[in-house]
């Protein structure tokens, strides 16, 4: 559901997370004395743009749900249409936040699968979908994005940065807004938060983007420096003219994610993503051999399983190993793997489902 364990490099843990000089959620107001933090946040923005394939990113938002709600409002500001489609396969907490924001901004949200979405009335401001979705399925949304654009609607993609290290980036199939959580880039779970959300857009939407952006300029002596730019939040201009009422960010956690990407490099991130995916493939093969059915053939790190035996029995064995599964309303189980999963974890999972060892 968008939360994963991860390995925090000791260098980042000691020098960033536990260093009081970095501990603030705010983006710096005094660029003259904050060039280091601003440069790190610019690295975060650059990382998000590189991975999502979009033109511009902000310096983080509060969480993925908030980012999705901000995407809804951006779509409404862009074309003034009051209907917004949401794919029901988005994470449930994201859907809940979007519906709450829509209720109080006068936007009608409709939960529809892509095949059910009708853009012919040209009254839809945008569409939000999850890639990969909350059940783990990886789907090609190119056709949906094209249909949305033909009617003047915007396409918003809630996604996973680690998955995008090996999947096709949203920018390549026409998405206008990409958003999600950067938590699994070296930020501990923290019992559910706080985590930094990312938000990236096409160049034509930059001036409508919520949150803060770090830009490059020159000082009085002509030296290249960093500063906050395009500050159209309500702290800086009249409330009714503001692009967003979000007045803070998650700067510390965004800096951790940026440093995680720098620490590993592009090849290192791809290696982590492939390792996670390979572990998921091993688990999926073991489950199928034991008679369990997978709901989706294309996935990255998450499986939805129709058990070939008693679900209660499986959950009982999982409790013995202190492993928590997601129980769907239809009785299927969800499992997500992450970079901390090792061979013993896979063996435990296979034992829980009555399968043979991964060895």
Predicted features by range, described:
Residues 29-33, 50-69:
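Short loop-beta-helix segment that forms the pyridoxal 5′-phosphate
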Residues 66-69, 73-223, 287, 304-305:
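Conserved PLP-enzyme active-site core in the AAT-like
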Residues 185-290, 295-297:
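Active-site C-terminal subdomain of aminotransferase-like
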């Amino acid at each position: 559901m968008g939360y994963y364990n991860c390995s925090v490099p000791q260098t980042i843990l000691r020098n960033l997370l536990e260093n009081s000089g970095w501990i603030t959620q705010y983006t710096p107001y005094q660029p003259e004395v904050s060039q280091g933090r601003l440069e790190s946040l610019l690295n975060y923005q650059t990382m998000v743009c590189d991975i999502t394939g979009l033109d511009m990113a902000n310096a983080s938002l509060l969480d993925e749900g908030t980012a999705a709600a901000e995407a809804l409002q951006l779509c409404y500001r862009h074309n003034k249409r009051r209907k917004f489609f949401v794919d029901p396969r988005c994470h449930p907490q994201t859907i809940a936040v979007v519906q709450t924001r829509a209720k109080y901004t006068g936007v009608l949200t409709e939960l529809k699968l892509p095949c059910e979405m009708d853009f012919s009335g040209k009254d839809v401001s945008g569409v939000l979908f999850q890639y990969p979705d909350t059940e783990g399925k990886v789907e090609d949304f190119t056709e949906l994005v094209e249909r949305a654009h033909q009617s003047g609607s915007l396409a918003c993609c809630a996604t996973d940065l680690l998955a995008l290290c090996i999947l096709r980036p949203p920018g390549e199939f026409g998405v206008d807004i990409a958003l999600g959580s950067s938590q699994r880039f070296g930020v501990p779970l923290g019992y559910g938060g706080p985590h930094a959300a990312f938000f990236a857009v096409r160049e034509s939407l930059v001036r409508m983007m919520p949150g803060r952006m770090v830009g490059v300029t020159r000082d009085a002596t002509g030296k290249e420096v960093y500063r906050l730019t395009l500050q159209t939040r309500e702290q800086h201009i009249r409330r009714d003219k503001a692009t967003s009422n979000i007045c803070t960010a998650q700067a510390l956690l965004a800096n951790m994610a940026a440093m995680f990407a720098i620490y590993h490099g592009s090849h290192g991130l791809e290696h982590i993503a492939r390792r996670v995916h390979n572990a998921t493939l091993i688990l999926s093969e073991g489950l199928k051999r034991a008679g369990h059915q997978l709901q989706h053939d294309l996935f990255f790190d998450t499986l939805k399983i129709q058990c070939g035996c008693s679900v209660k029995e499986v959950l009982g064995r999982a409790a013995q190993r202190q492993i928590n599964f997601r129980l769907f309303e239809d009785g299927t189980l969800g499992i997500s793997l992450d970079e901390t999963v090792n061979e013993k974890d896979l063996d435990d999972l296979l034992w829980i489902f009555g399968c043979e060892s991964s060895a």
